[in-house]
């Protein structure tokens, strides 16, 4: 059996804002990793509870930083700027890693020639008391072949940020989280990463994602507006080749994503997708007509072609 020789340093970054209720469980799950070449960075984003007291109780088992409040993206960026690892792994202060999370993903990298791939997986949802609710397994809905298409999982909202193992080099090549985005800083950056990087889906469930009351305090309207801007922005940036890569054709991609937007209440993005679909259809029809005219000119000449066009217009006039 081939021995695992690739054992890079992995930086687990835990951004925290008023997370005293759950952060000890998160830190303990990071410390319990079976893969030992890790550093654990806790970034206190201006908390006003007992976050600092809890973090300091771990001593030199973790790297602890305090900063003024700037949002999750800001705290993650602070950690990234101070990390030493070749790979980045995000752990929310209210979530948990399975003990083999990092080891399992490094084992995957050992089997791959491309060490700059982004690895992701499914996850388990838990409640406030850590009771299991249900499992989210993308491979129950889609084939691995599709889940390994770089932008496919992102544009189907299948990626949980804490499942990812990301090569640190991508932050140097592409940049950090947009700190002006309160709700969508993660998907905004994943989109940039996945346009240039390969992705690998693993069927294992390796994290527990907690659902609790404190997560519902954000203003729903503000969230919706930011997500609308995110999805609409993706549509405007995607190339024809990327749409074809994801769904086989631009028309199929736009049709499917329009359904996704409508189902999730992103009405502005839904309308944009429909408009782009109509534009593609009209554009394709115009291209067809132009080709037919050129063919007719070459075969029959200008006079006959004009007659054919006039006849077609009269026939199709309402």
Swiss-Prot record:
<keyword id="KW-0808">Transferase</keyword>
<dbReference type="Pfam" id="PF00535">
    <property type="entry name" value="Glycos_transf_2"/>
</dbReference>
<dbReference type="InterPro" id="IPR029044">
    <property type="entry name" value="Nucleotide-diphossugar_trans"/>
</dbReference>
<protein>
    <recommendedName>
        <fullName>Uncharacterized glycosyltransferase RT0329</fullName>
        <ecNumber>2.4.-.-</ecNumber>
    </recommendedName>
</protein>
<dbReference type="InterPro" id="IPR001173">
    <property type="entry name" value="Glyco_trans_2-like"/>
</dbReference>
<keyword id="KW-0328">Glycosyltransferase</keyword>
<dbReference type="GO" id="GO:0009058">
    <property type="term" value="P:biosynthetic process"/>
</dbReference>
<comment type="similarity">
    <text>Belongs to the glycosyltransferase 2 family.</text>
</comment>
<dbReference type="GO" id="GO:0016758">
    <property type="term" value="F:hexosyltransferase activity"/>
</dbReference>
């Amino acid at each position: 059996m081939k021995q695992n020789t690739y054992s890079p340093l992995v930086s687990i970054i835990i951004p925290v804002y008023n997370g005293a209720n759950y952060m000890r469980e998160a830190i303990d799950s990071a410390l319990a990793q079976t893969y030992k070449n890790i550093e654990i960075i806790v970034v206190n984003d201006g908390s006003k509870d007992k976050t600092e007291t809890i973090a300091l109780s771990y001593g030199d088992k973790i790297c602890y930083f305090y900063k003024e409040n700037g949002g999750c993206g800001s705290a993650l960026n602070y950690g990234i700027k101070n990390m030493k690892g070749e790979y980045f792994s995000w752990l929310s202060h209210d979530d948990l890693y399975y003990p083999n999370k990092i080891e399992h993903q490094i084992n995957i990298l050992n089997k791959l020639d491309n060490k700059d791939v982004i690895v992701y997986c499914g996850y388990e949802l838990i409640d406030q008391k850590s009771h299991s609710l249900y499992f989210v397994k993308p491979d129950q809905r889609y084939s691995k072949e599709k889940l390994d298409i770089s932008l496919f999982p992102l544009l189907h909202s299948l990626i949980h940020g804490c499942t990812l193992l990301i090569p640190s080099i991508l932050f140097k090549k592409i940049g950090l989280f947009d700190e002006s985005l309160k709700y969508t800083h993660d998907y905004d950056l994943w989109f940039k990463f996945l346009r240039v990087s390969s992705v690998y889906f693993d069927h294992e469930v390796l994290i527990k994602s907690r659902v609790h009351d404190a997560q519902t305090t954000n203003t729903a309207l503000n969230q919706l507006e930011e997500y609308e801007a995110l999805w609409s922005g993706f549509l405007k940036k995607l190339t024809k080749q990327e749409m074809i890569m994801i769904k086989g054709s631009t028309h199929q991609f736009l049709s499917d994503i329009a359904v996704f937007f409508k189902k999730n209440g992103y009405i502005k993005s839904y309308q944009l997708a429909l408009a782009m679909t109509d534009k593609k259809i009209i554009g394709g029809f115009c291209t067809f007509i132009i080709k037919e005219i050129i063919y007719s000119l070459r075969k029959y000449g200008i006079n006959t072609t004009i007659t054919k066009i006039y006849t077609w217009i009269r026939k199709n006039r309402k």
